[in-house]
Each structure stands twice: as C-alpha cells, then as structure tokens.
C-alpha cells in the first residue's frame, strides 16, 4: 500500500470531492441517527448530536482519513437496557467512560489484535453488513404506495446512470435533491424524514451527567461501557481495514482507537450517545470520492447546519431517495467475488465465512459474528496443525527409532501417545524430535509419559534432537 497522506493532504488534498461527499453523508446520516436513537430508546436529537460531535472530533483525532463515525445500530443495541433501567443521564456517563476505556486501549496498542482476524472473517463481516444494510430498508416498504416504488426506481436510475455522463457531483446527492424537489413540487404522498421522528433546531450544549459520583454508579455503567468500548473498536478497526483496501492507503489504527475514545468523551459531555465508525456511511463517502479528513468534518458540520438552519427542509426529504442510497451501499459493499470463491477456497475458509454471515444476520450483532468466526478459525487451525507424522523403523532387533514431525501441544498429544508400540521385544527406543516442537506443558507431560510407559516395559527411551526452546520447556516442567 502507499504511504499515509501528509496532514496537509489529509485535509486539503481533495477539497471539492471531500466537501460534496461530506454533504451527501450528512443527508444519509439523518435517518440513520434517528433510527438508532429509537433503537436505544432515546430522543432522536441524542443520536443527531452524537453523530455531529463524533464526526467532527474523529475528523481531527482519528487515524483513518475519509472514514465516517457517528451513532450506530450496533452500539445502540448495547444501550437499550441501560436507558430503560437507569435513564438518559446514566447513558451520558457510560458514553464518557466508554471513551476513556477506548483511549486507554488505544494507548495500549489494541489494534495489534487485528492481525488475528482472518480474511474469511473479514469477508463474512462485509457480506453480513451488506445484508443488514439492505434488510434495514425493508420496513420502509410496509404499506408503501406505488409512488414510493416509483421514487425508489427513479433514484436508483439517477444513482447508476448519471456517473456515465458526469462525476462532477455525487449521483446519490443529485438523486436526493431531485426527488425532494419532485416530492415537494407535486405534493407526492410518500414517507419523509420528518415521519421518522421530531427534529428540533436546538444546538447541543456542554453538560455534566446528572448522576451520583459514587462507586455504585460505576458498578452500573462499567459493564455497559466495557461492552460499548469493545464493540465500537471492533467495528471501527474492521471498517478502517476495509477502507484501507478500498483506497489502497494505510491507516494508524491505534490512533483511530484513541480518536474514537476522545470522540465519545466529548459526545457524552454534549448530550450524545456513544458511537463508532459506520461502514455504510464510510462506503458512501469513499464511493462519492471522499478521501480526506475534510469529508468527515463537512459531514458533521453540515449535519448540524441542516438541523439548526434547514430542519424545515430536511423533514421533507423522501425516504425513498435515502433508501435508494442505502441499497446502492449494500450492493456495493457485498463482496460478490466471494460467492465464486466459495468453491475455490479451502473448505474451512468457506465454512468460516458462511458461519460469520449467518451469525451476524441471525443475531443482528456484528461483534458476535466476528467472535464466532475467529473462534471457528482458531478451532480449524488447531485441528490442522495438530496432525503429526510419525515414522518408525527398527535399526536392529534391540533398537527402534521413531521420527516425529509436527507440533506437540495439547491438541496433538493423544495421537502422539497412541502412536508408539510399548510392548515390543526390544531393549532401546530413540524418539527423534529434530522436526518437532514442544509448545506447552501438555506436550512436555506427554513426552515424559511416553518415556515412563517404555520404562514400565523395561525398555530404555531416549529423546533426541529437541530444539533449544523445547528443551528449555522440558527442563522447566521436569
């Protein structure tokens, strides 16, 4: 990949496209933020304030230019019971603590753990997210009139056909503007952004959560904050990796982790809910040409401008146009080549990808899908490397040599122990471990057990060819 942009390039190297992409993202953020607020059981303005604050702060402190962060559904799901049981002020306190935890994790270089997520899990994550984005649009069609479908079709035509003639302005932005003008001019009876929830023109202001500063409060919010911190970082770092690949650039994921934390701390003090990177909006931004920090900054700033100044216009935007944008995102996000790859890839990789997708879709939780995928990959990997190759041959009537090739650890010791002939009319056995490695106490104990079993039969057993690390472990466990 190319080297990361300089700070100047990150802000001003792509001004026109970053501004236009940011405007498009701001428009697409509104129904998302409102919808996620409803999921969390809070006022729509809480999600909108969060999206504004997080987008602005992450544009400054984040480690992945061009990535969009705001209020998200995965975070909203975690908050539901906290809001229901303890109220909004505890949510603000939990959001601040979430940010503090994320900053600490960022300083601890948590992003290093990303290397343990296999490609098959990444592909499963992306495909599952595409399915979730698409399925999230389906409720908009319940009881919809023909005009809804007509505007959806018209929006999709603009989105996919306009780029053939010009790319000066993002086609999804043109689709939203054109459909809004048509809906307002001809009084088309379609569902609008205003139907999603009440949007006031008030700006966020600084506040300190009205909760007791006691250990009991910490006991209440800490479990939620831990969950929010890890879910947020997982989704953010995976999204950063995807945008890295889409743009062929590098990102500083530890800086991104710290940036997410700072953004959530600020958000909590301004009446917002915890958020993280949004892959859907990030893909919209990337496909619209957004590459720099300016795109995220414009998205946050324009979102607040829309709320504070143009809320009377925003509420008239037809949902059909925004649904069309999200359909475009879901189609563009899905890795269609992975379907062909199912037959070509190793069976275990295909199983991991499919299981990851199914887990996410069934649970509606990206973090659970990734966890199951990584766990399954680990099981398959352990099964693969636990296979030992053991060859034996008799040197003479008194000596037999065993050559062991492979990894000796907890998963391979049963096969190892059963591979030897303990009752044989010989005097001496040599176990050649030149091409083997002892990894843990299970492996060391198994070798000791093998030697002891030969000794019980009056046969002398010698371990030969242990490498330095294996020999050290054997001495340590003796």
UniProtKB/Swiss-Prot annotation:
Keyword field: Cell membrane, Membrane, Transmembrane, Transmembrane helix, Transport
Family label: Belongs to the SLC26A/SulP transporter (TC 2.A.53) family.
InterPro entries: Membrane-Transporter-like (IPR052706), S04_transporter_CS (IPR018045), SLC26A/SulP_dom (IPR011547), SLC26A/SulP_fam (IPR001902), STAS_dom (IPR002645), STAS_dom_sf (IPR036513)
Protein name from the UniProt record: Putative sulfate transporter YbaR
Pfam families xref list: STAS (PF01740), Sulfate_transp (PF00916)
Membrane-spanning intervals of the chain: 19-39, 42-62, 65-85, 87-107, 121-141, 143-163, 168-188, 220-240, 259-279, 295-315, 345-365, 366-386
Compartment(s): Cell membrane
Membrane topology: Multi-pass membrane protein
SUPFAM superfamilies for this protein: SpoIIaa-like (SSF52091)
GO cellular component, one term: plasma membrane
Gene that this sequence comes from: ybaR
STAS domain segment(s): 389-478
Superkingdom of source: Bacteria
Main location: membrane
One Gene Ontology MF term: secondary active sulfate transmembrane transporter activity
